[in-house]
Amino acid sequence: MKQNYNIHTHTTRCHHAVGRDEQYILAAIEAGMKTIGFSEHMAYPNVEIPAERIYNSDIDEYLDTMYALKEKYKDQIEVLVGFEIEYYEDQKDYLLKMKERCDYMIIGQHFRYYDGYNYDYFNNDEDVLMYAHQIERALELGLTKYVAHPDYFMLGRREWTPACDQAAKVIVEAAKKYNAVLEINLNGLRYGKLYYNEGMSYAYPHPELFKHLTQENKVCFGYDAHHPATLLEENRIAICLDIIQRDDLVFLEDIHEIL
């Protein structure tokens, strides 16, 4: 199975990716993609998390550089300029303002609070439900129609509980209601299989979440690229589909449906 776009791509500005901006574009062209979208981790005013997000002071340069590259490569590939956001109610106005400065946003919730509390370090059932409602709220406000790694919370826990089912239903129903696509993240494989009470499994993609999807939900692959050559690793798709073990998923063929 092949997908001709990827809009989950990072740059060195998040401080945990490598490679020049143009190397990601050239890799996408070599992979036969028609669209490559950059979605750098959003910074929030008055707080910096250096290992996780772009600096506030780098945002203008990021946008200027990416829009220049969009123009430079327009005859070879479509380049989209965006951000990977996390939703916090007290940052709503800021996020709505930033949405006007870019082509698109995706939501990839990593923290409970805008200044920390990593869901991937540890999360309890209350945290999981908060995670789901943060995603739901971002979709409700129209900030995005793309949910990155909806199963990310499984990095910070070792059991799939009824609260996880409840959270999955919230996310899946919100995606359905607001016509959002759910991402099958191709980068979770890097963590390897983890020990869960139910047995060893990858944190994400996690099969339990995808059991909740219906034919009304659409999915896509997200390379979540932090290295240019990742965009050439098409074999990740087959591996992740084997993990999910569903052959009736509805794939989003045209990314412009949600932009």
List where the protein language model places each region.
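Charged catalytic cores and adjacent phosphate/nucleic-acid-binding surfaces used
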Residues: 1-7, 11, 21, 154-155, ...
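Divalent metal-dependent hydrolysis catalytic cores, especially in the metallo-beta-lactamase
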Residues: 7-10, 24-53, 77-84, 110, ...
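Active-site environment of divalent metal-dependent phosphoester hydrolases
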Residues: 12-15, 42-47, 87-89, 112-116, ...
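Alpha-helical scaffold elements within enzyme catalytic domains, especially in hydrolases
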Residues: 27-30, 72, 137, 173-174, ...
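Extended substrate/RNA-proximal surfaces in nucleic-acid metabolism proteins
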Residues: 49-183
